[in-house]
Amino acid sequence: MTLLDTMVVVYARTPDSPFHQWAKEQIAGAVAGSGAAINAVTLAELCAEEGMEAAEVAHQIAGIGIEVFDVPASAAARCGEAYRNYRRQRKRESDKDSPKVPLPDFFIGAHAEIMGWELATNDPRRFQNYFSLKLVMP
């Protein structure tokens, strides 16, 4: 199974994106192979996009064969641990604070790691630094 980072789905729906073709190919390849998935965090991010109704987003996602999964409870502790490490490193390197609540990428990365899934992303920085998982990148 390939878990899709939110921006992979966004880029696949954005013809003028420099990652449009790559994103479409990743989704199509995953759907035809072991499966393509997003989680509830990604679904929320997609539904937050201006002008997008939740029913329309769900219809589009299902229409191209992407499965939607809840984030497993077992990923919560891993998400928190990775985000805590990120906050410490950010504070140490830049003396800047981060929000106390984990950013969406940490839920997505923890989910992929816990499930043993690969993760398709065009922005590997946080995933490489805080998780042990296979990344699919342009």
Predicted stretch roles:
Residues 1, 109-138:
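Acidic, PIN/NYN-like endoribonuclease modules and their adjacent C-terminal/linker elements
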Residues 35, 65-67, 118, 134:
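Conserved beta-strand segments of alpha/beta enzyme cores
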